[in-house]
């Protein structure tokens, strides 16, 4: 009762990294609230295969739903599992990944339970709230923080009266870490038939095709990212060359992606990928809130910008004032000279 729950996604018997990141965050939230962390995982043939991918992150109780028809994911069975389980357990918080599955499952569950859901959160915190209209004071609510209105503001959203408080978070936003404290580590295997009616299995997945990743932007130790200031698709060729020399990957701002200069899968930010490289080189990027949300935890941030007052310069460790056209070729030249 009143615990923090994390829905864990799987591919076969492999737990998604975003779920492990959320377990880490969920453990911190549970500690702050003085409650337990519980996890839910559903699939086929997963008993004995997923427990040790979940429990080390500080889970007090793990609910493993194992039955034919639960993998590959389809909407109805997984929705029934969470809705019926939550009616029994009455969690105060539920977290899930802002993935294809999470974006389908989260709204279904929140709608069924008439609770709120905040998508694509960049921060999750615990805090108090005073409602100026009702003059009610609420203790220890979940602050669901995310950029809003096109990234022009950072909104803090609360759900005072309805439970669970639900939020989705993109992969890479939270850091995952094995929990060093004590947790119960209890595992239960509920009877799936008590939670999922046979009619939920009406949809069958006949075949699946998973496209191989074109790059490793999320895991790159060096990211060279370009914004609208790069000027053209040809300008990005210079960034690809620099990234190749540095053994890094190329990222982009939303403005550059919208201009058609680079593919969407390279977009860094609130509506793209969240990265944690050792070095992030921002080329011609102004630094809108939604972009900064996806790269602010980089080890070293280098800004190349013709505008010395660009917002991104406020978080940059090093600033090179100049155009991308004049600075990047020099970086390539001098790196080649000094790396021989």
Q: What kind of feature is each model-predicted range?
A:
Residues 1-340:
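N-terminal glycine-rich FAD/FM-binding segment characteristic of electron-transfer flavoproteins
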